């Protein structure tokens, strides 16, 4: 537990204007996340499946959609660390962040006007790539907008407001879908899509405006700091030559050299994590395991209901219910972070998810599905928020973009291994209940690695 003096200091502070502006971006991007989870797959199939020219079967549509997600995941994982490292070097994080948001929002709105399923998937992948890139910069901004003792609470506010705020544009999008040809038939499928994507894109952009205006990058890598970071890796030809080239001039480097410098720094950081920053390395392993379990459950929630032949409308209602519970859960754990260590709360969240996985063995009706949704909501946002804030505390703030780029690789892997496990269980003849229950292994092993990270000597920049 933390000292009473620390608790008193934290309780006397409300969200500052910078913290509030940062939190609002979660409200914007979460709207797109919810749309992508609930309606985009449906709209994709409405364009792809049929007997018309260029249309395909439902199974092939599902397969192509999965391929699109895989492509998006790989590209996002590759460019994330490079984008973060460039922003750290050049003190231009705000400019690059703004660019990713504007392109992402524009692509989101354009998605509603696509006439074919192929173009729909191409624009969807483009939107998701820029959306994911924006999150690298956004997460790394946490070290600039607040202090270390408030990171848990501010990060939790971001997820909480995001879960709640995302329901507003989603309800409009859902109403447009209900009025479409699949249900009431009042409007065309094209108009339903245009409304859904446009409302989400506009919402995403408008709530980001305060962050555009208020954010200032405080932590960044100077030339001197950059040399210090690489001094232990000068035996590497690529890094050594890059440093020599950089020292020839004080002018801003060109784009290609900037990218080369960023790649060199990433290799140096990976070496540093492996050899010196082992606390960060152990946490990243733990994070990859338990967040993979989280992502798998989220991505397969509709499949769970479908396999159990549950009412589709009831599933959507419980999806919204989960958003509200996740909002409350994030706020509760944010308050608890004033009293308890971040790692203690992470243990609770991981244990909670472990219990949810075991509960899946008893799941057989819509009520049980709702109980499981409640359990997921209690810990979903809290686990994500506390992981983000804990990582912010144990990394050097001037390299936050670069470190969060690496963090993003692990986050983007969420549901990769878990989905393979679920597929293997299903192909072997197992039920969806058993498949979800196997996710408990990911949380158990992740718990062990988090314990190892927690016990490891903290680096100088940690203040947990």
Regions found by a protein language model. Give the residues of each.
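Juxtamembrane intracellular "pre-TM" segments in multi-pass secondary transporters
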Residues: 6-19, 217-284
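Helix-loop boundary and gating motifs at the non-cytosolic
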Residues: 13-73, 279-318
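A membrane-interface helix-boundary motif in multi-pass transporters
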Residues: 56-59, 177-202, 424-443
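Helix-to-loop junctions at the C-terminal end of transmembrane segments
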Residues: 78-91, 328-341, 426
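Structural signature of the two symmetry-related core transmembrane helices
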Residues: 95-109, 344-359
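Helix-loop junctions at membrane interfaces in 12-TM secondary transporters
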Residues: 112-124, 361-372
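Glycine-rich segments within core transmembrane alpha-helices of 12-TM secondary carriers
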Residues: 155-177, 408-418
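Multi-pass alpha-helical transporter architecture, strongest
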Residues: 203-214, 437-464
């Amino acid at each position: 537990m933390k000292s009473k003096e620390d608790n008193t200091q934290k309780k006397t502070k409300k969200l500052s204007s910078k913290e509030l502006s940062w939190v609002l971006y979660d409200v914007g991007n979460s709207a797109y996340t919810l749309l992508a989870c609930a309606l985009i797959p449906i709209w994709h199939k409405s364009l792809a499946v049929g007997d018309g020219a260029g249309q395909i079967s439902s199974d092939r549509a599902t397969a192509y959609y999965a391929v699109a997600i895989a492509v998006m995941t790989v590209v996002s994982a590759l460019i994330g660390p490079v984008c973060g490292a460039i922003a750290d070097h050049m003190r231009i994080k705000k400019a690059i962040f703004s660019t990713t948001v504007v392109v992402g929002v524009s692509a989101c709105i354009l998605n509603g006007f696509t006439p074919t399923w192929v173009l729909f998937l191409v624009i969807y992948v483009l939107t998701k790539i820029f959306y994911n890139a924006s999150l690298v910069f956004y997460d790394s901004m946490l070290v600039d907008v607040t202090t270390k003792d408030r990171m848990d609470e501010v990060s939790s506010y971001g997820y909480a407001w995001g879960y709640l705020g995302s329901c507003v544009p989603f309800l409009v999008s859902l109403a447009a879908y209900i009025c479409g040809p699949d249900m009431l038939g009042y409007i065309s499928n094209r108009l339903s899509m245009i409304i859904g994507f446009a409302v989400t894109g506009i919402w995403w952009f408008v709530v980001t405006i305060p962050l555009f205006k208020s954010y200032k990058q405080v932590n960044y890598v100077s030339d001197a700091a950059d040399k210090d970071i690489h001094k232990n890796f000068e035996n590497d030809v690529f890094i050594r030559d890059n440093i020599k080239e950089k020292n020839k001039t004080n002018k801003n480097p060109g784009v290609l050299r900037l990218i080369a410098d960023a790649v060199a720094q990433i290799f140096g950081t990976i070496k540093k994590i492996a050899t010196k920053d082992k606390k960060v390395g152990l946490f990243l392993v733990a994070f990859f395991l338990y967040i993979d379990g989280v992502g798998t459950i989220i991505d397969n929630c509709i499949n769970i209901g479908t396999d159990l032949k549950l009412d589709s409308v009831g599933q959507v209602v419980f999806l919204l219910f989960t958003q509200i519970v996740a909002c409350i859960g994030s706020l509760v754990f944010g308050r608890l972070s004033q009293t308890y260590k971040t790692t203690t709360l992470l243990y609770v969240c991981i244990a909670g998810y472990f219990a949810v996985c075991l509960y899946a063995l008893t799941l057989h009706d819509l009520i049980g599905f709702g109980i499981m949704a409640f359990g997921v909501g209690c810990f979903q946002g809290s686990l994500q928020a506390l992981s983000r804030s804990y990582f912010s505390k144990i990394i050097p703030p001037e390299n936050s973009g670069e470190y969060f780029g690496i963090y993003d690789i692990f986050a983007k892997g969420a549901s990769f291994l878990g989905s393979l496990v679920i597929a293997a269980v299903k192909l072997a003849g197992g039920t969806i209940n058993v498949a979800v229950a196997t996710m408990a292994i990911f949380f158990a092993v992740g718990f062990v690695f988090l314990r190892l990270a927690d016990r490891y000597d903290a680096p100088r920049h940690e203040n947990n």
